[in-house]
Amino acid sequence: MEIHYEYAIKRGDHRIIVLPIYNMEALEALLTRRSCKSYRPEMPSEEVLNKILEAGTFAPSGRGAQAAIIVAVTNKEVRDQLSQMNAEILGTKADPFYGAPVVLVVLADRTKHTYLYDGSAVMENLQLAAHALGLGSCWIHRAKQEFDSEAGKALLKSWGIEGDYEGIG
């Protein structure tokens, strides 16, 4: 990693401290990531998927509460069930996941004051990591309605998730 230093500048009684500037690929990822609405049917490798999930777990959270959890849905039947639930909420028969072979569900604990922000930060980390690893992603909404439904609550229970969780994306 290449490091460039800038100098501290003093203006009047205020001293401005300028930290090192890093030539990082992260900035490029931030500027070039776009939502993808067409996917290849191949499942990403377990290694790639784990790197994306790990990046999601490093998202910031209010007071370190870690209110969000991520569920990687790689089972086609469950993925298709989620797709159907989401499509019904949207009022369409089309696949709202655009054929993506894996769906990452982010849920956040409603009892934490910053749960919506925490879950949203996880979503962004997941998307940036996917982009950095050459995969497309798209934040699909309606997860709140999905997991507030009886079918959604049954899925959470089958996954061993207990508590007051809201679907973020």
Short names for language-model regions:
Residues 69, 101-104, 136-138, 169:
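Structural motif
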Residues 88-124, 128:
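Helix-adjacent hinge/juxtasegments
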Residues 94-96, 154-169:
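A glycine-rich helix N-cap at a beta->alpha junction
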Residues 19-102:
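N-terminal amphipathic, basic helical "cap/leader" segment at the start of enzyme domains
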